[in-house]
Amino acid sequence: MVKAIDKYWLFGVRAHQDDTLLDALGRGGGKRRCGSRITPAEGAFMLGVPNMIMVTGDNAEPVPFTHDAYQYCESFRPLKRVMWSSCGSSGWRNGNEEAFICDISHKYDNICGAYLDDFFTRFGSKPQEHTDELLACIQDIRAKLSAAARPMPVYVTAYMHGMKDIAKSVMDLVDGLVFWTWQSKELPLLPERFQQAEEACPKHKKLLGIYMYDFTTREAVDMELMKFQCEYGLELLKAGRVEGLVFEANSVMGIGLPTEEYLREWIAQTRDVEVP
């Protein structure tokens, strides 16, 4: 029997990565929100989720093959499944990510895939104008991942508002999509947009990303919208339309967001729901 908790993931980044974006608490003279020191492993422990997508920052940290990177892997030993980023925040790449993923796949049995964050805009804000570069990059990534201990499927961040700008030839080279609604005010459009994504990408594996914090407004996601996206995600999961839910992120945890408190309780309440 498969339970919902088996398909819950944390979107992990280094502690303090988003501190400069956590500055909106009490606008208009109120106190500043302090940064988050919560690590990815701590975030997974706090939420009680067993799977991790570890994404490097736009400064490349944790840098592949460093002590920091290996220590993150050590902290993930209790987790069931871990994807590591081939492409980090803002589309950052060092170029040795695939070699590192192959290396850790031989050392840690839970390494299960490569993740491309912000990949579609890494060559510019209009991905439809950079199809050749995107194709060449993905082909290179996939070729290098062939040295891994087992097949490493490639998943990519897909923002709901930008799906129409991605060439089909590019989409066809990735195995899975993690769908995100960047501006929380657009969450009411999620059912319609997700159906369109299903029709456009019927063969891809799909996960739904869920934000606790809106980086465009510098505020916690509205509670009603938070409840909506969680419940809709569970509905998709029970229907077999997605294979997982991804919660973003440890870097906004431990600072008192009401959405984090809600999410912890919601995960505890739904963890034993049977899913396909």
Explain the meaning of each model-derived region:
Residues 1-276:
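Glycan-processing catalytic domains of CAZymes
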